[in-house]
C-alpha cells in the first residue's frame, strides 16, 4: 500500500492542482485595481475548491502557535504576535485536514507566519503570491504559487495573462517530526495561556499619551 502523503507533499500536490485548474480555465484579468485583482484570484481559488468538492471559508480565524507577549512601543502597549489572526481562505475537506491559503501582492505581510504555523500543525499550506519580486523565504511545509502580473501607472492597474502549467511553484523544506512535536507542545502551552488570560480580570486598554 502506498504511504499517505505528508502535509509537505500535500501542499505541493494542491499547488500543482490549483495551477492546472487556473491553466485549464484560462484564468486572467486586465486593468484591475489591487483589491479587484486579489478578489479575482480569491474567486478563482474558491471555484477550484468547489469543483474539488470542498467547503470554502473566507477570513477564517486561526491562532498563532507561540503565545503573545505584552510589548511596549512609545506610549502604547500591544500584544505580539496578536491574539488572533485570519487566513484569506480555509478549504475544508472530508478526507483530510483543511488547506490554509494566503493571497498576497507582496512579501510584506503576515502570510509567512500564518502559513508556517498551519504547516507545523500538519495542515497543507498554499501561498499565492502575485505581482512583484519574490524575496521572502518559503516556510517549511508551505508551497508558493507565483502569479506575476504587469502594472500600469496613474492610475495603477494590474493585468495577468492566462496562467500556464509552467507557473512557478516554490516549496519550503520538509517539516521534521521533531519540529512538529515541539510546535504542537508550544500550541498546547498557548491554549493554556489563553485560558489563564480569560480567567484574569480585564486589564485596562492601551495607555495613550
Where are these regions (language model features)?
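Surface-exposed beta-strand edges and their flanking turn/coil or helix-capping segments
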Residues: 69-72, 113-116, 159-160
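Active-site metal-binding core of divalent-cation-utilizing nuclease and nuclease-like domains
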Residues: 27-95
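Domain-level recognition of nuclease-like catalytic cores that cleave nucleotide substrates
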Residues: 130-209
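Generic detector of low-complexity/intrinsically disordered segments
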Residues: 72, 91-93, 128, 173, ...
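Nuclease catalytic cores
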Residues: 2-46
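Catalytic cores of nucleic-acid endonucleases
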Residues: 84-86, 97-150
Amino acid at each position: 500500500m502506498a504511504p499517505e502523503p505528508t502535509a509537505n507533499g500535500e501542499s505541493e500536490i494542491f499547488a500543482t492542482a490549483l495551477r492546472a485548474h487556473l491553466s485549464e480555465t484560462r484564468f486572467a484579468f486586465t486593468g484591475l485595481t489591487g483589491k479587484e485583482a486579489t478578489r479575482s484570484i480569491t474567486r478563482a481559488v474558491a471555484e477550484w475548491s468547489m469543483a474539488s468538492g470542498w467547503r470554502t471559508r473566507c477570513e477564517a480565524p486561526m491562532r498563532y502557535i507561540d503565545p503573545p507577549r505584552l510589548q511596549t512601543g512609545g506610549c502604547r502597549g500591544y500584544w505580539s504576535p496578536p491574539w488572533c489572526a485570519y487566513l484569506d481562505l480555509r478549504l475544508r475537506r472530508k478526507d483530510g485536514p483543511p488547506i490554509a491559503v494566503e493571497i498576497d501582492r507582496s512579501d510584506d505581510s503576515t502570510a509567512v507566519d500564518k502559513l508556517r504555523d498551519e504547516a507545523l500543525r500538519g495542515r497543507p499550506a498554499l501561498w499565492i503570491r502575485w505581482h512583484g519580486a519574490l524575496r521572502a523565504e518559503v516556510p517549511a511545509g508551505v508551497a508558493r504559487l507565483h502569479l506575476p502580473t504587469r502594472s500600469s501607472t496613474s492610475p495603477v492597474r494590474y493585468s495577468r495573462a492566462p496562467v500556464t502549467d509552467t507557473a512557478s511553484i516554490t516549496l519550503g523544506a520538509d517539516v521534521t517530526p521533531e519540529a512538529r512535536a515541539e510546535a504542537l507542545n508550544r500550541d498546547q502551552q498557548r491554549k493554556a495561556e489563553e485560558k489563564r488570560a480569560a480567567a484574569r480580570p480585564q486589564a485596562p486598554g492601551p495607555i495613550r499619551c
